[in-house]
From Swiss-Prot:
Residues 102-122 are annotated as: Disordered. The gene is ureB. It is found in: Cytoplasm. NCBIfam families: PRK13203.1 (NF009682), urease_beta (TIGR00192). It catalyses: urea + 2 H2O + H(+) = hydrogencarbonate + 2 NH4(+). This is Urease subunit beta. It comes from the Bacteria.
């Protein structure tokens, strides 16, 4: 072996295989690009992005760790989302959850606290 050398095994690696996935259409209605990282709670993404936030609750982009998706102004993209795993807790970000994703206080038919579909900025 040569110092620093690495050897790859034949075949491919499937990221996020077996995870429940859904597709959502996203439109950037803002005047600036928006970039969302791989593990960001998608429902809390920039309000300039128009999409079904309720459906995206508890989900992240189905892309490799450390990567991101970029939405230019006016862009319309379809992205795949998967459920957040682990302890399923979200803290910070846009402060919409700040705790466990499951067992929240949402009422049937009502948006979850902090996850409103309307844009709240100018």
């Amino acid at each position: 072996m040569i110092p620093g050398e690495y050897r790859l095994q034949p075949g491919s690696i499937a990221c996020n295989s077996g995870r429940d996935a859904m597709v959502v259409e996203v439109v950037n209605r803002g005047d600036r690009p928006v970039q969302i990282g791989s593990h960001y709670h998608f429902a809390e993404a920039n309000r300039a992005l128009e999409f079904d936030r309720e459906a995206a609750y508890g989900r992240r982009l189905d892309i490799p760790a450390g990567t991101a998706a970029r939405f230019e102004p006016g862009d319309r993209k379809t992205v795949q989302l998967i459920e957040l795993a682990g302890t399923r807790e979200v803290h910070g970000l846009s402060n919409a959850v700040n705790g466990k994703l499951d067992g929240g206080t949402a009422v049937a038919g009502e948006p979850r606290p902090g996850i409103a579909a309307e844009r709240d900025h100018q």
